[in-house]
Amino acid sequence: MKKGSKREAGGPQAEQPEPLFSGEDRSLSDGNIVDESDSEESQYSGLEDSGSDSTEDEEEHSSEEIQQNPGKSPKEIRKVPHRPSKSEANSAAAEEDKPSAAKEYENDSSDEEDIRNTVGNIPMEWYQDFPHIGYDLDGRKIFKPLRSKDQLEQFLDKMENPDYWRTVHDKKTGQDVRLTDEQVDLVERLQRGQFGDINYDPYQPSIDFFTHETMIHPVTNRPADKRSFIPSLIEKEKVSKLVHAIKMGWIQPRKPRDDSPAYYDLWAKEDPNAILGRHKMHVPAPKLPLPGHEQSYNPPPEYLMSEEERLAWEQQDPEDRKVPFLPQRFPCLRAVPGYARFIHERFERCLDLYLCPRQRKMRVNVDPEDLIPKLPKPRDLQPFPTVQSLIYRGHKDLVRCISVAPSGQWLVSGSDDCTVRFWEVGTGRCMKSVLLEGAVKSISWNPNPGLVLVAACVEHSVVLINPGLGDRLLCGATDQHIGGYQPPEEEGQQPVSWGEAEGTEYSNGLRLCIKHQKAVKQVTWHARGDYFAVVLPDNGNSQVLIHQLSRRRSQNPFRKNKGQVQKVLFHPTRPFFFVATQRCVRVYNLLKQELSKKLLTNCKWVSSIAVHPAGDNLICGSYDSKLAWFDMDLSTKPYKVLRHHKKALRAVSYHKQYPLFASGSDDGSVIVCHGMVYNDLLQNPLIVPVKVLRGHAIHRDLGVLDVIFHPTQPWVFSSGADATIRLYT
């Protein structure tokens, strides 16, 4: 019996079937549970819910027994167990089942009483694409009711059905539900913003439970909870998080509140001695133009209008007239009448003052030093020649031209003393001197390292000289190359005559002599050393001639020369030919036989030109002391014009390996500049003057006549009118 009572008192074990008792002994088992509820085992079993249930059952049975036996006390009834018969037990069980079934839904407050299916409170959107709306208790599908009404049937139903307006569709059952009057009334009240319950009075009189009178006893005498005087763990965690945030700098203290008034006086800090605020933006009116000569009472005759000009002035509109009045002449100032346009001009002036807007011209104050480009310091651009190292003496007259061998070991110079001298660069020793028939105007060493050959301009001839210096094999190969020429069977007519040197001239080093009809001014070699060009100072069509050494053939590349040719040059890598006239430099394409570019020098008289080893840049010197740098990829106008020299420029030159170029002038100085050309076409060349080299004496108003760089070292040679050649390293 105790085991059965304990199982029935337990919560989860009460649901299991009880084999010890049948349905007939239900009242007996209940009575035993009531009797055993006061035992020690039930008190210390730990099942609080079973104890409460047993006490409730005990009270129900005791009340029933008291009603049946009104003369006995509850203790006596509890002590005497009642063992009913089988028929009484069945009837009692039936009576207990009836009120239990009736009381099942008395206190049920569920909102799902009217649900006719068992799908549960789930979103019906889950089954919108299925033919069923859920499952019943047995796991079978609950199919949706058939809704085969089309729009016409729905419209007829709307017109004919009087309850259509109070019919709604239930999504959970899939059926149309007709709202009752109470439900319609509830909907209308909610639409009006009223409470759903009709009997609810929101304005019922309030009862002030706590009064102003101090009461002796508290309202509630409930003891304080244990958690009220135990530190809270949640607050501890919050405090630890706040401390960590403060340490990490995530929480900053509040900034001190600014108690300054929101409205303050704008002119509180105004200096009383300063200009008033309304005059700070004052724009003064433009002044009236001063009177001119035409407004004089005795103007010059050229300001007086003739009759034709007067008629034309009168026919013009007042807005188109250059002068708003007719100039007049009076014999004296006393004869001048009053000015008739005075009031009109004052009125127009007043209109201009208050109708015409004024604009303040913002003048930018720019520091002049900011306009100067920031150039690197010269010491950061080394190496470049800085000091005079050697002086080559031996010529008796001014040295007009110099040239350096491709190896850089030998130097050749031509002078007005009719000699060509060969010097050793390292020692300054004159290795050989060749006497010619006249003054040497130009000289050039063959750039081909396989040939030892020098071309010099003497009067009407160009002389080719083999100095016999350096490697004997190269000297012999040069003579063999010149002597191996075989004349063609039919010689065409040429503008010049080629002749070979013999006897004493051959022993002095002369090999060929090319005679021209006029004096030769300049000679220059092609980069391969087979072609060389000469310039004849003449206004005719044959100012420029190109000679070929291997075939001993000469030709005139131009039918007509525009302007007087000053200098010519070959492009170092491309088939271009530069021709410098007095004002411009023309670039010709020898393959296409056409003019490629025309560079405008903006100079009065071009004296010399030089081409950068890369071939994209060119410098041009002039007699008006200007040096123009041309970037041929950029423009046909000078990229930069340098005016460093005080007198005429005589020569300019590029270095073949270093970013250097130099210019020599009649002021006796040689200026060396750093000229860096970048491979990036978007970056302009960098030009920085680095050194001014002096040393030449001015003779007959002439200074430095020629400048040339050493082929491999950052050295520069200069020849001057003082009959000397100087080396700067």
Curated annotation (Swiss-Prot):
It holds the Pfam family BOP1NT. One of its GO terms (cellular component) is nucleoplasm. Residues 50-62 have a biased composition (Acidic residues). Transmembrane segments: none annotated. GO terms for biological process: maturation of 5.8S rRNA from tricistronic rRNA transcript (SSU-rRNA, 5.8S rRNA, LSU-rRNA); maturation of LSU-rRNA from tricistronic rRNA transcript (SSU-rRNA, 5.8S rRNA, LSU-rRNA); regulation of cell cycle. The keyword Repeat applies. InterPro entries: BOP1/Erb1 (IPR028598), BOP1_N_dom (IPR012953), WD40/YVTN_repeat-like_dom_sf (IPR015943), WD40_repeat_CS (IPR019775), WD40_repeat_dom_sf (IPR036322), WD40_rpt (IPR001680). It comes from the Eukaryota. GO terms for molecular function: ribonucleoprotein complex binding. Keywords: Nucleus, Repeat, Ribosome biogenesis, rRNA processing, WD repeat. SUPFAM superfamilies: WD40 repeat-like. Residues 95-106 have a biased composition (Basic and acidic residues). It is found in: Nucleus, Nucleolus; Nucleus, Nucleoplasm. PROSITE patterns: WD_REPEATS_1 (PS00678), WD_REPEATS_2 (PS50082), WD_REPEATS_REGION (PS50294). WD repeats lie at residues 394-433, 435-475, 515-557, 560-598, 601-640, 644-683, 699-729. Residues 1-115 are annotated as: Disordered. Belongs to the WD repeat BOP1/ERB1 family. Component of the PeBoW complex, composed of bop1, pes1 and wdr12. The complex is held together by bop1, which interacts with pes1 via its N-terminal domain and with wdr12 via a high-affinity interaction between the seven-bladed beta-propeller domains of the 2 proteins. The PeBoW complex associates with the 66S pre-ribosome. Component of the PeBoW complex, which is required for maturation of 28S and 5.8S ribosomal RNAs and formation of the 60S ribosome. This is Ribosome biogenesis protein bop1. It comes from Xenopus tropicalis.
